[in-house]
């Protein structure tokens, strides 16, 4: 039969979907709407955190408020039964200023440093290191136009992608 799935496969998919829904609901109770956007996608949950929640303007190290936010979600991430948690860093297309140019030649390096700092903090808060990875995309994956201040603000973000949940 073409297009049929076994009852066992169907039940496993229903259980997995329920796990993603539970994770999404738990994260929504831990974070305010102004702190993060949470989306449940096919096979993953994505948290989008705006850069000012985590970093000083042009900075790459997570500030105290950002550390507090990450500490709030770390226990949930630690117990999420995920096989992979990828922290992705993104920037706008404004070139790196002279103060940071020697450390970060481009937005690519800045976005990677931001993602890496978030990973370090999550690991320090108890998220298993073997689940964590950091990736930087610079200005290569904008979610809004870089032609306006509002669009650039949307593009400066960190996304935490939780995937491969197991029962």
Map each language-model feature to its residues:
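Soluble periplasmic/extracytoplasmic beta-strand elements of cell-envelope proteins
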Residues: 37-39, 44-54, 84-88, 117, ...
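Bacterial Sec signal peptide processing site at the extreme N-terminus
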Residues: 2-22
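Heptad-repeat alpha-helical coiled-coil signal-transmission segments
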Residues: 17-20, 24-27, 31, 38
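Short small-residue beta-strand/loop micro-motif enriched in glycine and branched aliphatics
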Residues: 6, 55-58
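Periplasmic OmpA-like peptidoglycan-binding domain that tethers envelope proteins to the cell wall
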Residues: 59-64, 90-167
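Charged catalytic carboxylate motif
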Residues: 19, 69, 114
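Periplasmic peptidoglycan-binding/anchoring modules of Gram-negative envelope and division proteins
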Residues: 25-33, 47, 58-89, 93, ...
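Extracellular/periplasmic catalytic domains that process cell-envelope and extracellular macromolecules
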Residues: 39-41, 69, 79-80, 127, ...
